[in-house]
């Protein structure tokens, strides 16, 4: 019987390709060398430096599984290994990277127009544009069926009203992908620019955990979203749950 290896109980190491090991090792070197020395201070101060997103971008971590728009196009396994190394230091790094990649870039890539993809994905890939995703609400958590945020059709676009809470990256984000229901009850994705009138994305302060994560609200008071900023490829629960 083979000796049990406590560090690798599922024998994952034996199942990885050489490329996957190289990606994992590069992520580990960066996380341990560059991020680990920062986290105690950041956790004490409830601080996250957005410049780290540009470092993620240089390493190809943002949108890493997307096959185009200059993204790395790596496997889901490889991306999971990167995420594990970020999480090994602190969940704030994995959260910031994961929200940008999986909750903002991926829906834009899947459901967005060509113009939306060209406008947002290259900048988000490089960490020059930070995104957040608004689903969770104060009264219903992440239960999309109970969503109260509304998108009312007006000339040239929509007006969004509602509040999203516990939103990773919102205090730093230049763009928010907000999921809202229209007047027929259909769920759609709306891209809101930070400087939009009626939009406020303040920080949630005094957290007892995940303190180095930049977490906040998305408050919307009849925020105008032009037609061209609505994701055209989805109008159902499939969008936020993809």
Regions found by a protein language model. Name each.
Residues 127-135:
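A short, Trp-centered hydrophobic/proline-enriched beta-strand micro-motif
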């Amino acid at each position: 019987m083979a000796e049990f290896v406590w560090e690798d109980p599922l024998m994952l190491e034996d199942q990885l390709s050489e490329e996957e090991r190289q990606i994992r090792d590069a992520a580990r070197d960066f996380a341990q060398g560059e991020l680990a020395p920062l986290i105690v201070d950041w956790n004490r101060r409830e601080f996250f430096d957005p410049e780290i997103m540009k470092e993620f971008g240089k390493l190809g971590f943002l949108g890493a599984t997307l096959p185009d728009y200059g993204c790395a196009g790596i496997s889901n396994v490889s991306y999971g290994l990167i995420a594990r190394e970020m999480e090994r230091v602190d969940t704030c790094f994995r959260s910031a990277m994961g929200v940008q990649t999986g909750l903002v870039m991926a829906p834009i890539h899947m459901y967005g127009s060509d113009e939306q993809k060209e406008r947002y994905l290259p900048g988000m890939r490089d960490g020059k544009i930070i995104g957040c995703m608004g689903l969770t609400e104060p009264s219903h958590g992440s239960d999309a069926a109970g969503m109260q945020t509304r998108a009312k059709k007006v000339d040239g676009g929509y007006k969004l009203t509602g509040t999203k809470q516990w939103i990773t990256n919102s205090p730093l984000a230049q763009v928010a992908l907000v999921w809202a229901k229209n007047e027929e009850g259909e769920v759609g994705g709306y891209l809101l620019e930070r400087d939009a009138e009626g939009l406020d994305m303040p920080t949630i302060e005094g957290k007892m955990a995940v303190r180095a994560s930049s977490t906040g609200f998305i408050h919307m008071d009849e925020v105008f979203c032009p037609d061209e900023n609505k994701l055209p490829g989805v109008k159902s629960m499939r969008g936020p749950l993809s």
